[in-house]
Amino acid sequence: VMACYNAMIPHIVTDLPELQASALGQQMKSPLIYTTVGLRQWRAFKEQGIGLAMSPGNLHQTVFMDFPVSSGGYRYTQGPDEPCVVQMISCPYSEVLGKPRAEQYREARYQMLGTPFSAYEEEVRSHLGGMLSSDHFDFDRDVASLTVNRWAHGYAVAGPGDSVAIGRQPHGRITIANSDSASEADAIAAMQMGYRAVTELSV
């Protein structure tokens, strides 16, 4: 069972039928940025009633309070004067709209990887400072940590037409899985594709 970035499979399995190799080569992954902001307190979010904010036009299109999960010796924040984590998500895109999707992802990927940490920090400062009231939020006082996680090849995105279905066909003793073969970027799809791939194995 090959459960990897599906576009790489033709480079590993070099005797694939041309149609299948071409279909796998058309699968894409969008770039993705997950920024984690550690706050010393989150009273500004509480006072403004913000749990999640959609921010079109900003680098980070989604901002939300982290999920209230306690595990082991860790317990999630119990009140707005305690530390918490805020997640900021960005799905970068090309500055030139209307281009083919693959080109937009490529341009966004290069721009994302070429951006220094200081620029991300300044964007988060501006974003949160513009969204939250200065009565309860001061970036320098309230932000304890900032982590920017960049994935050049983040979420699976379907290629054109039937390329996903064609690409995931068994080849000899090889079956193909991973979320790429469902063109959905989540664990459930990955497990479903893994199950499918195992059932396709010839005994």
Please place each PLM-identified region on the residue numbering.
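Conserved flavin/dinucleotide-binding core of flavoenzymes
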Residues: 38, 44-203
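A short, hydrophobic secondary-structure junction motif
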Residues: 1-7, 119-124
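Glycine-rich loop(s) and the adjacent beta-strand/alpha-helix scaffold that form part
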Residues: 2-55
